[in-house]
Design a protein with these regions (language model features):
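Catalytic cores of alpha/beta
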Residues: 34-42, 79-94
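Single conserved hydrophobic/aromatic residue that forms the stacking wall/gate
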Residues: 1-8, 12
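Short beta-strand/loop segments at the ligand-binding rim of alpha/beta enzyme cores
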Residues: 18-27, 66-73
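Glycine/Thr-rich beta-alpha phosphate-binding loop at enzyme active sites
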Residues: 20-25, 32-59, 103-110
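Glycine-rich beta-to-alpha transition loops that act as phosphate-gripper elements at the mouths
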Residues: 9-10, 28-33, 52-54, 73-80
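C-terminal helical cap(s) of enzyme catalytic domains, especially alpha/beta-barrels
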Residues: 20-21, 87, 104-130
Length: 130
């Protein structure tokens, strides 16, 4: 949910302000550069941008060009195939949902396969940050 949707604007501001005051990490969601900027200005730990695959790594790069100190977390559609591209353009992390936990591996109780899947993701992140 964007930080400044009309109905929830005050609620989000209060949440970010409270968490900042109490030293609680908070990662509000945003879509537009203005929403991202405002979330950061309020004191967000980092800003979750969604949907990452619709916006793409180029969007992250473009937002960070004039505001390189922003901490962005692309979320929504991030997978082992595209995770490195988000780190290479400056994302500090990503949000992974269903692509993190391979449903077929879980359904088959293939814990070694799941472990290998996690290792592959970790390797992609490590290599992208080098």
């Amino acid at each position: 949910t964007p930080l400044y949707s009309s109905a929830a604007s005050d609620v989000y501001k209060r949440q970010v302000n409270y968490c900042t005051k109490e030293n609680i990490p908070i990662f509000p969601g945003a879509y537009t550069p203005l929403e991202i900027y405002n979330a950061n200005k309020l004191g967000a730990t980092a800003v979750k941008i969604f949907p990452a695959t619709q916006l793409g790594p180029g969007y992250v790069k473009d937002v960070l060009a004039p505001l390189p100190n922003l901490k962005l977390l692309p979320t929504g559609g991030v997978s082992v195939d595209n995770i490195a591209s988000f780190f290479k353009v400056g994302a500090i992390g990503v949000g992974m949902g269903s692509s993190l936990f391979d449903k077929a591996l879980i359904a088959n109780n293939d814990y070694d396969g799941l472990f290998q899947h996690f290792k592959k993701i970790a390797k992609e992140v490590f290599n992208a940050k080098q």
